[in-house]
Amino acid sequence: LTLRVAVVGGGPAGSCAAETLAKAGIETYIFERKLDNAKPCGGAIPLCMVSEFDLPDHIIDRRVRNMKMISPSNVEVDIKLDNPDEYIGMCRREVMDAFLRDRAASLGAKLINGRILDIKITENGKKPYVLSYSDFTDGNNEGTMRTLEVDLIVGADGANSVVAKAMDAGDYNYAIAFQERIRISPDKMEYY
């Protein structure tokens, strides 16, 4: 009997889960709807995560050792790392996510450029779950409707999780990430 697992969401959590499953010889499918998705969140990663994700140097765009954080109420916090070997790695999420997905795929996980539309949860888990999805692999913006039966589902599809909704995990009342771009005059900037 071969265990089949769908990992919904191909960001860091989903890709690392898929990598672990594939290493264990489990038939693994990674679903990601936007393979080139540039996201504002998660671009700053601490040194411990660089080693935990086993990221190569080319994934890290910049190594930040000094920064200033300013809250909306104008409270400032200066962060300085004294050890020259320590840094916060700045990376582009679309680059890091693609690297992690590709690594999982190289171990046998099957990457599906698709969007989950529906999940049929079976009674008592005695039958496989049925995922209905739009497959964008052929480049068609509408996608081709497909289904896949799996034994387990890993929900790594973010704040508006289709998996969480399907299992009635409840609603989220708080934003967990945001991005704001502001223009600052050069005399207000500090360079390190």
Q: Predicted segment positions?
A:
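N-terminal Rossmann-fold NAD(P) dinucleotide-binding loop
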Residues: 14-15
